[in-house]
Swiss-Prot record:
GO CC annotations, alphabetized: cytoplasm
Active site: residue positions: 62, 128, 130, 135
UniProt keyword Hydrolase present: yes
Known EC number: 3.5.99.6
Protein family per UniProt: Belongs to the glucosamine/galactosamine-6-phosphate isomerase family. NagB subfamily.
Record protein name field: Glucosamine-6-phosphate deaminase
GO molecular function annotation: glucosamine-6-phosphate deaminase activity; identical protein binding
Disulfide bonds: none
One GO term (biological process): N-acetylneuraminate catabolic process
Length: 235
């Protein structure tokens, strides 16, 4: 596991983009993508580059259950606004946030992941150490599944909604096994609120109580983080 300290998210996006260019030069075809504020500067680097992504495939980590793709709070909408509209991919897959028959959607998405092995997976991290929407207690051998969101996750995401009651309580998420199947992983972490989770991810015990600690079992993980997120690790 490699840890790169950056001044801010802008620098973090540039560092990640250099890693991406190296992976693409070595034949990467499929990118695993994440939402949230952490990867935004990385996506900006992609959009502003002259690289052609029209032969690449993307698969996203997760999607809320109950939000249509046209809903501004859906992750499909987020990806369209921040990346896909400006930099089209050959194919872009996201879980469908269907309320009915979620089991069929889980099966469909696991097949997509089997058909499109991820070369580089992008991650953020939750305050409780979740990656994707894999909350504490998620088995490390889990594949795509329906998730009941932790209250801390709902509270953290409430800032994106008019009121906390509007935040979906369920999501469909890649499982930890799906994430670890990626050849390479970049995890972004910014701010003091992520410090405890990062300390456990890098140097704590590998435990299902901290989903991101599973990354210690992966051979090629790069953590890009600022001083605040690394503050407990450096003490």
């Amino acid at each position: 596991m490699k840890v790169i300290k950056v001044e801010n998210q802008v620098q973090g996006g540039k560092v990640a983009f250099e890693i991406l260019k190296e992976k693409l030069a070595n034949g990467a075809q499929t990118l695993g993508l994440a939402t949230g504020s952490s990867p935004l500067e990385f996506y900006k680097e992609i959009v502003e580059s002259d690289l052609d992504f029209s032969n690449l495939t993307s698969v996203n980590l997760d999607e809320y259950v109950g939000l249509d793709g046209d809903n501004p709070q859906s992750y499909r909408y987020f990806m369209q606004e921040n990346l896909f509209n400006q930099k089209p991919f050959k194919e872009s897959f996201l879980p469908r946030g269907v309320k009915d028959n979620a089991e069929a959607e889980v099966e469909r998405y696991n097949q997509i992941l089997a058909d499109h092995p991820v070369d580089l997976q992008i991650l953020g991290i939750g305050r409780n150490g979740h990656i994707g929407f894999n909350e504490p207690g998620t088995p490390f051998d889990s594949q795509t599944h329906l998730v009941e969101l932790d209250q801390s996750t709902i509270e953290a995401n409430a800032r994106f909604f008019a009121k906390i009651e509007d935040v979906p309580t369920q999501a469909i998420s890649m499982g930890i096994k799906n994430i670890l199947d990626a050849k390479s992983i970049i995890l972004f972490a910014y701010g003091e609120s992520k410090a405890e989770a990062i300390a456990g991810t890098v140097s704590g015990p590998v435990t299902e109580n901290l989903p991101a600690s599973s990354l210690q079992n992966h051979p090629d993980v790069t953590i890009i983080a600022d001083a605040e997120a690394l503050s407990l690790l450096e003490k």
